[in-house]
């Protein structure tokens, strides 16, 4: 029986394109599975457990994801970080590790998250872009999408932006920032001449909420829905989303902020 005596907060970066999300699942490759397997190699035993601050969907990447390690032995954070990075796959990196006290709760204390959704339109992008962004063949009305993105700011009922919404769930969420701008976060010689990023920041999110918000704005940019449709969708009425679940490979968990 594991008796937790020591607690460590791990800050992670990963390219999610070849993984089935963060959380361990039977017979598929996940980030948590790879981390746990590497911890066994580094520590020489499996007398620990890990818990993520949040889940991520398959193919979603992270610039700043966090998890907590519960251990029954003291571990030097600097040694552990170096050892993990020597043994983890090249698409997973531990950026830092810090010891925390037993009252720290990695899920409850992670109060603010910032997501980025990258997209472009027009001529098909270079295949090397596939892990990083969503491509739309048709022209998008970017100014209209920018206007639509601002509607999400504030407290709203996001029932229509939750995958398989349960009627008993609280769908009220507060979005502190929602905006679309030209992408200057990630660039490369193979990137399109111009690409865009939807930046969404909030205290908590429903399942696939950000991807449904992105899909809704893409439909707005294609002229398939209106600004008024988005406004009405935030009262929680209706049975079906007005948008679609945008491809996961465009989504990045960019920041996780703790109390």
Question: Where on the chain are the PLM-derived regions?
Answer:
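Structured-RNA-binding interfaces characteristic of tRNA pseudouridine synthases
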Residues: 1-259
């Amino acid at each position: 029986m594991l008796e937790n005596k020591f607690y460590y907060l791990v800050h992670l970066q990963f390219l999610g394109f070849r993984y089935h999300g963060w959380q361990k699942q039977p017979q598929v490759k996940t980030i948590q599975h790879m981390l746990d397997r590497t911890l066994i190699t580094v520590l020489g035993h499996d007398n620990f457990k890990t818990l993520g601050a949040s889940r991520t969907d398959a193919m979603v990447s992270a610039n700043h994801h966090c998890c907590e390690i519960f251990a029954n032995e003291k571990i030097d954070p600097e040694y552990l970080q170096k050892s993990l990075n020597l043994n983890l796959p090249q698409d997973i990196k531990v950026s830092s590790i810090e010891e925390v006290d037993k009252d720290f709760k990695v899920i409850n204390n992670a109060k603010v998250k910032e997501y980025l959704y990258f997209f472009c339109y027009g001529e098909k992008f270079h295949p090397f872009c596939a892990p990083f962004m969503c491509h739309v063949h048709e022209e998008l009305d970017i100014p209209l999408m920018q206007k639509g993105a601002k509607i999400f700011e504030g407290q709203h009922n996001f029932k229509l932006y939750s995958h398989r919404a349960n009627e008993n769930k609280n769908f009220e969420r507060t979005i502190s920032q929602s905006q679309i701008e030209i992408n200057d976060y990630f660039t490369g010689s193979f990137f399109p001449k111009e690409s865009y990023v939807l930046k969404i920041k909030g205290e908590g999110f429903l399942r696939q909420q950000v991807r449904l918000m992105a899909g809704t704005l893409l439909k707005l940019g294609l002229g398939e829905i209106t600004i008024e449709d988005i406004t009405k969708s935030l009262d929680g009425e209706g049975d079906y989303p007005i948008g679609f679940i945008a491809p996961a490979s465009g989504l990045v968990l960019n920041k996780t902020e703790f109390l």
